């Protein structure tokens, strides 16, 4: 039976690696570690074997740690005393990062396979790096540029003039137009970039609304990841910008002229309306909605299902709809609960008096 973690039918495998290589990967000094051992892969605490590395980032799984058979476990220094005999503790102050590094060591991304699939349609004026991969049935438009070591999956549509930087990966069924894509950008299957923004004259004519031409672009900076079935509309007269290092979850909507700073995180089903600007390191949780023309300050956090209708100050946290600062929101919730208890108590007293 195939292992759950790193099933070789789906994931490339490397190794085995000695303990010293694993320690080097996470920046752990090799001195002081137990005897040299070979490790063949990674696995969860519950299923790991003595030849595998596991990890723990949440104390609530400490029972699984005590019972694990893993040969080594990556964990925070404060949890090292829970490691059972026979298991090596690989301590890290950033255990999630360390786990990502070790998992990537054993399961590196597959390299691009240079070449253009015979079923792909590539305009003669497109410039494609010699070591880029163009998948089956993909279409590359006129004057498009595909950078070194890019991997374009099957059934992808790359529009005229689109630029995709080196080492980027575009998943199947993605469409990209009117866009400039940076380096090391990952776009997951089904995403849509560069289509018309939702711009029209709000007063209907006898034949309906008149569309305002959307003359801007989409700019995706370096090291961005865009989730499956997410959408980024091009700007109306300026650019829609996704800042370097940002992450968009699946099913996210970014409207025209929106500008995200560096390392923003937008969680699934969130939507950001036109011309709203996010500073660096902003987090927008799942199903939150932001109206247009807002400014969200650096480091702000938007709670799940929040309805944001006004600007949000830097490093503040808001929840609810309409969104309120977290402390104010829960103060109101507590007040409403007290009022409800008083009302219920009053009903009981009235009923007792009638008896």
Predicted features and spans:
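Structural signal for interior beta-strand "rungs" in well-ordered beta-sheet cores
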Residues: 55, 115-325
């Amino acid at each position: 039976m195939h292992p759950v973690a790193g099933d070789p039918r789906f994931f490339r495998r490397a190794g085995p690696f000695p303990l010293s290589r694993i320690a080097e990967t996470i920046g752990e000094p090799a001195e002081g570690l137990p005897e040299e051992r070979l490790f063949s892969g990674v696995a969860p605490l519950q299923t790991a074997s003595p030849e595998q590395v596991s990890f723990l980032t949440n104390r609530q799984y400490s029972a699984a740690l005590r019972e694990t058979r893993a040969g080594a476990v990556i964990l925070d220094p404060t949890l090292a005393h829970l490691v059972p005999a026979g298991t090596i503790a690989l301590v890290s102050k950033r255990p999630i990062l360390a786990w990502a590094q070790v998992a990537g060591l054993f399961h590196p991304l597959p390299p691009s396979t240079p070449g253009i699939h015979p079923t792909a349609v590539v305009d003669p004026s497109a410039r494609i790096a010699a070591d880029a991969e163009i998948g089956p049935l993909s279409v590359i438009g006129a004057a498009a540029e595909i950078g070194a070591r890019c991997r374009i999956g099957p059934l992808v549509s790359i529009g005229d003039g689109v630029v995709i930087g080196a080492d980027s990966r575009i998943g199947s069924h993605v469409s990209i137009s009117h866009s400039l894509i940076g380096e090391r950008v990952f776009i997951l299957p089904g995403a849509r970039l560069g289509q018309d923004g939702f711009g029209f004259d709000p007063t209907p004519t006898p034949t309906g609304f008149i569309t305002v031409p959307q003359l801007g672009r989409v700019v995706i900076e370096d090291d961005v990841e865009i989730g499956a079935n997410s959408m980024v509309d091009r700007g109306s007269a300026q650019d829609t910008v996704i800042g370097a290092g940002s992450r968009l979850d699946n099913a996210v909507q970014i409207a025209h002229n929106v500008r995200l700073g560096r390392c923003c995180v937008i969680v699934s089903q969130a939507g950001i309306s036109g011309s709203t600007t996010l500073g660096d390191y902003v987090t927008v949780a799942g199903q939150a909605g932001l109206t247009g023309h807002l400014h969200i300050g650096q480091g702000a956090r938007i709670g799940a299902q929040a309805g944001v209708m006004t600007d949000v100050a830097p490093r503040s946290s808001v929840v609810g709809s309409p969104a309120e600062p977290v402390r104010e929101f829960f103060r109101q919730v507590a007040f409403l609960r007290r009022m409800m208890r008083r009302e219920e108590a009053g009903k009981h007293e009235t009923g007792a008096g009638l008896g």
